[in-house]
């Protein structure tokens, strides 16, 4: 689970050097990277070979994902899933940056001030990445606000509809903002047409995992040896549960 890849060195940000080393490791050691369709196939087939499979996910849709992460993903032929907040996405085409990206805290402040297009990807950028066959754009809701009251269904449906309309694809996966959800939210997501629901709960997924409570692992700005250790621990469900029971 990633958010930012840039040079800011801030909260939930991975530096370019470490991110490239992480992706290079996956490529060199023969890991298979998944999009949501690949992942769904594994969940639906108890006999599927899930050895050395990983899903790279990015939350929010920050512009540094396009500017820094995507070229590295292309270089190593790595698939990734981008969960985007559709009300933040704009129509200003493809941009070329010549300045450093702000920190996560600054990005959130810029979005709150109504200037999301300065720090978030555009529909054209998302469309180009989708066309590569490497990037799978899915929903992180429409507003990234606390989901309560009678607006939840509208929020989830609007996000799904925009992604399908703008990118000409099916949107059947949803990632909950801040990992906050309840049983009613799950029911509304299913009613909206989602089939895969991603959480921030730490852990490993297997063919027996629920598609409505998909776990993830936060990576962070770590070197390749620590990255390798995380992959080893969480490649086995039993070992992952034991580790998280001790260190969570």
Task: Describe the residue ranges of each PLM region.
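Metal-dependent polysaccharide deacetylase catalytic core of the NodB/CE4 family, i.e.
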Residues: 2-6, 51-54, 74-182, 213-214
């Amino acid at each position: 689970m990633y958010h930012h890849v840039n040079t800011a060195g801030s909260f939930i940000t991975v530096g370019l050097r470490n991110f490239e080393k992480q992706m290079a490791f996956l490529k060199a050691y023969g890991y298979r990277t998944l999009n949501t369709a690949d992942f769904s196939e594994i969940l639906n087939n108890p006999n599927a070979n899930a050895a050395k499979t990983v899903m790279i996910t990015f939350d929010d849709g920050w512009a540094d994902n396009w500017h820094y992460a995507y070229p590295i993903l292309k270089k190593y032929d790595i698939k990734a899933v981008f969960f985007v907040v559709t009300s933040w996405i704009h129509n200003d085409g493809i941009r070329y940056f010549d300045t450093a990206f702000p920190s996560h805290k600054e990005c959130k402040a810029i979005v709150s001030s109504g200037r999301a297009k300065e720090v978030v990807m555009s529909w054209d950028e998302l469309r180009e990445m989708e066309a590569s066959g490497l990037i799978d754009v899915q929903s992180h809701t429409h507003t990234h606000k606390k989901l309560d009251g009678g607006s939840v269904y509208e929020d989830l449906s609007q996000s799904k509809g925009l992604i399908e309309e703008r990118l000409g694809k099916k949107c059947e996966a949803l990632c909950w903002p801040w990992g906050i959800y309840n049983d009613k939210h799950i029911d509304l997501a299913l009613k909206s047409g989602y089939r895969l629901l991603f959480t921030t709960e730490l852990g490993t997924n297997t063919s027996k995992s629920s598609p409505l409570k998909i776990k993830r692992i936060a990576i962070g700005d770590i070197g390749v040896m620590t990255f390798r250790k995380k992959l080893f621990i969480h490649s086995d469900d039993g070992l992952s549960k034991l580790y998280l029971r001790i260190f969570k």
